Amino acid sequence: MNIMSDVRVRFCPSPTGTPHVGMVRTALFNWAHARHTGGKLIFRIEDTDAARDSEESYQAIIDSLKWLGMDWDEGVIVGGPHEPYRQSQRMDIYKDVLEKLKEAGFVYPAYSTAQEVEERHKAAGRDPKLGYDNYDRTLTDEQIAAFEAEGRQPVWRLRMPERDWKWNDLVRGEIEFKSSTQPDYVVARSNGAPLYTLVNPVDDALMGITHVLRGEDLLPSTPRQLALYEALKVIGVAQQTPEFGHLPFVMGEGNKKLSKRDPQSNLFNHRDAGIIPEGMLNYLALLGWSLAGEKDIFSVDELVENFDVTNVLANPARFDQKKLEAINADHIRLLEPKDFEQRLRAYLTEYTDFPTDYPAEKFAIAAELVQTRIKMLGDAYGLLSFLAIADEDLTLDEKSAKKNLKETAIPALDAGIAALEGVEEWTTPAIEAALHKALIEDLDLKPRVAFGALRVGISGQAVSPPLFESMELLGKESTLTRLRATREVTPYQVAAE
């Protein structure tokens, strides 16, 4: 279609397992194409495999789209003019289409077993693994009757036109498959149950899908779908053949596709670690597409404004965890402080044991201290947890203590404690001034030596939010209690030693 607003794309996952980042990337590109063109996104569910499909997986797909902020115009939950949008509820539609294909001669019954096909290949000197040989398309009535008398139940195969197949792929340009590579294929089982090879194009046809954007693994099946569309148009089911675009593989480590067994493939692992939706969407978009000018950080609005499926790269895209985290860090920094504070509080409440009763005014300050220091929301827990525990529950990280609480740290701790005891107005500027005078000016210590021991003393870690601000948040009593306890174990020694 030429009118951009007539664009209709679909996202049609199978509800098996947990949402894979490759699947979600496919959803994103379809969503971005629909939003960029002013078209519509149709969301339906391919749940015809009763043995593997589950309601839990279906809900997980819904949750993944909602978390990322991707909406749809027609489909499950929201409804639309082509209901139902779950294939398991459309079986009567598929059976009706199958009967029309039978009546028009586009499909035929095939009785050959896999063993018989292999034996015919061997007898002809061909590779026995070549696949179906189209033998049954010319069966006589007598042969069919004989098979029926044996009790055989046929599968139904689409009669593939004997010609080469060419089309202009939106991502890969001109594609050609030779006729010899496209045998007649099964569209319905021997029990009459329609297969994916039939139901998916039928749904696309009846729902007026104009662009099929899907994974590269489905590229070899395109000639079959083109042939089926020709038949569907003849019997009045399809009005047009959609354009196809095959999106690049998402690769994992090395040269392998990102497997479902790889933890990085699970979208929810990233959410649970503290990747925010803006960071995830930005990174997923980069798995095959990029904004002009090599700009890696962009908003959802910028993605929608600039997305062009013809600019998607055909080469495989490698999933890079470090790059995802770096992009996420940038998006965390772009959040308004109040927005970040609310998201961080919600995250820590859901995924950690950070106290829900920690004072709101203190949490707002703490959040501001870590917003520019974390890559994922989950990083904040390790930086902030020391603020919310009892002084006696603080434990020193062994590596940090061994490095920062040596004999040379004793003067810094003694002088620091003495200086802080004299601070009357417990504010960040007053704390900083007192410690700077006592440690840097009076003792002539380098800041790393002067403040390293104090940092470990109040937080248990060598890395924490800014020292003076952290002391203000802890309060004078807790700060001094922790530093005195640290002084008692300095120089620090591992118990086993």
Swiss-Prot record:
It catalyses: tRNA(Glu) + L-glutamate + ATP = L-glutamyl-tRNA(Glu) + AMP + diphosphate. Gene3D superfamilies: 1.10.10.350, Glutamate-tRNA synthetase, class I, anticodon-binding domain 1 (1.10.8.70), HUPs (3.40.50.620). It is found in: Cytoplasm. Its EC number is 6.1.1.17. Pfam families: Anticodon_2, tRNA-synt_1c. Its main location: cytoplasm. GO terms for molecular function: ATP binding; glutamate-tRNA ligase activity; tRNA binding; zinc ion binding. Monomer. Belongs to the class-I aminoacyl-tRNA synthetase family. Glutamate--tRNA ligase type 1 subfamily. This is Glutamate--tRNA ligase. It comes from Corynebacterium diphtheriae (strain ATCC 700971 / NCTC 13129 / Biotype gravis). The gene is gltX.
